[in-house]
Design a protein with these regions (language model features):
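Conserved lysine of the Walker
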Residues: 50-51
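Walker A (P-loop) phosphate-binding loop of P-loop NTPases
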Residues: 47
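Accessory nucleic acid-recognition modules appended to NTPase machines
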Residues: 2, 69-71, 211, 215-362
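A short, basic N-terminal segment
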Residues: 1-36
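Interdomain motor-coupling "hinge/lid" segment immediately C-terminal to the ATP-binding subdomain
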Residues: 2-6, 13, 144, 149-250, ...
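Hydrophobic anchor at the beta1->P-loop junction of P-loop NTPases
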Residues: 42
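Short glycine-rich substrate-engagement loop in P-loop NTPases that contacts/grips substrate
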Residues: 72-107
Length: 405
């Protein structure tokens, strides 16, 4: 146990342990939440950088907090597998930390628990310490159900959530050391920015993917990420019997990203019953592989019943499609979804006489790879005007090169 704790907490002996970590845009927000009493949950898919963000937070804490009052533990370690059904083992881990590190108990302890969903009934342990101890909990998890079923009965009102995603385009530019902040830099680095945009639209923002230039390795990494989520998270959590069927459905969805979803039609095509398809898609959503959006209706019951559109959580997954050349328009539309989904509380599409790709609060978005043809431009704006006769919305036409308002 002691060797595991020391391995996970190099900052106890080396205050510069995390100096080479690449910063994330979410860091200031995450650090600001450290001053609150509530449990902080960093939620997102596997390998988007939740653990890295946690360690960047530790780096900031080390400026004002004693190193041994900061405790990080990764519950995915093989040594913990035999105990994952026993939440009381979490108390044993914490007790071993107290004995080994001997933190200053008169000061707050910052307890980082990575991939907490590994342990069944973990929330009972967290609540017991939360109520009676001077401990700030920061937990990470790879399943959106952490914020619904598990939290609902035990930790309601005690949790603040931050959604963690793969690198944004601006983070990608920083990683590539391409300056873009000023208009002069944007003009001077126009070629480099354009090349980076092409690469980002095609391969997405997973750190391991953008860290290599080999396209074969990129694709292998993306496949490994997707199948780790399927076989390590979804299959055991939901007790899936036919895992190959689940995998096949995911690759079919990848090949049809940005399309409308018809459960009955899909069932006929791939020989899986519609009820099972619906369940599997919910599992993919719970584990941040895909997302669905509904058609906008003024009546919520109609919106819930409407046909869903499918999007991927990261553009890189588009490369895993079956016998498909990736369409530029699909890449751009999926990336626009990824960006809007980060801040839009209720993202929908509109399907009336003309389709509008996205509705977010008081804005309507159309996505077209290019609008050099005047007829194409007129068609896109006609969709806005047809839906919004009273001019209640802002119109945004997004192309590869620009956003028109």
């Amino acid at each position: 146990m002691e060797s595991i704790l020391l391995e996970d907490n190099p900052h106890w002996n080396n205050l510069s342990a995390y100096d080479n970590f690449i910063s994330r845009e979410l860091l200031p927000k995450a650090v600001s939440y450290l001053t609150t009493k509530q449990i902080l949950a960093l939620i997102g898919a596997r390998r988007v950088g939740k653990s890295t963000l946690a360690k960047l937070m530790i780096k900031e804490l080390l400026k004002t907090v004693e190193a041994k009052n900061i405790f990080f533990i990764n519950l995915e370690k093989p040594e913990f597998i035999p105990y994952k059904q026993d939440a009381s083992y979490l108390a044993e881990i914490f007790d071993n930390y107290l004995k080994l590190a001997n933190p200053n108990l008169s000061e707050k302890i910052y307890f980082f628990i990575d991939e907490i969903q590994i342990f069944k009934n973990w929330e009972v342990f967290v609540k017991s310490k939360y109520e009676n101890s001077n401990i700030k909990f920061i937990i990470t998890g790879s399943n959106s159900s952490l914020l619904t079923s598990d939290f609902a009965t035990v930790l309601t009102g005690r949790v603040l959530k931050i959604s963690v995603h793969s690198f944004s385009f601006t983070e990608f530019l920083k990683f590539k050391n391409i300056s873009y902040g000023s208009r002069i830099e944007q003009i001077s680095n126009k070629i480099e920015i354009s090349r980076a945009k092409d690469e980002y639209l095609k391969w997405g923002g997973y750190f391991d993917v953008i860290s290599t230039d080999d396209v074969i390795i990129k694709k292998d990494i993306l496949k490994n990420i997707a199948e780790d989520i399927i076989f390590k998270d979804i299959v055991p959590r939901y007790n899936i019997k036919n895992s190959s069927q689940l995998k096949d459905l995911f690759y079919y969805i990848v090949s049809n990203a940005t399309s409308s979803l018809n459960y009955l039609g899909l069932a006929k095509k791939i020989n899986i019953d519609a009820k099972t398809i619906k369940e599997y898609i919910n599992y993919f959503e719970d584990n941040f592989l895909i997302h669905t959006i509904s058609s906008y209706h003024t009546k919520m019951t109609e919106q819930i019943k409407s046909a869903k559109k499918l999007y991927l959580s990261d553009n890189g997954f588009l490369n895993l499609g079956i016998n498909r050349t990736i369409n530029n328009g699909v890449m751009l539309e999926n990336e626009v979804f990824v960006v809007l989904n980060k801040f839009c509380e209720e993202l929908t599409y509109i399907k009336e006489n003309y389709e509008i790709d996205f509705r977010c609060e008081n804005s309507l978005y159309q996505v077209s790879y290019n609008i050099e043809d005047e007829k194409t431009r007129q068609r896109e704006f006609r969709a806005f005007e047809n839906f919004d006769s009273e001019k209640k919305y802002k119109y945004k036409l997004i192309t590869y090169d620009e956003t028109s308002l």
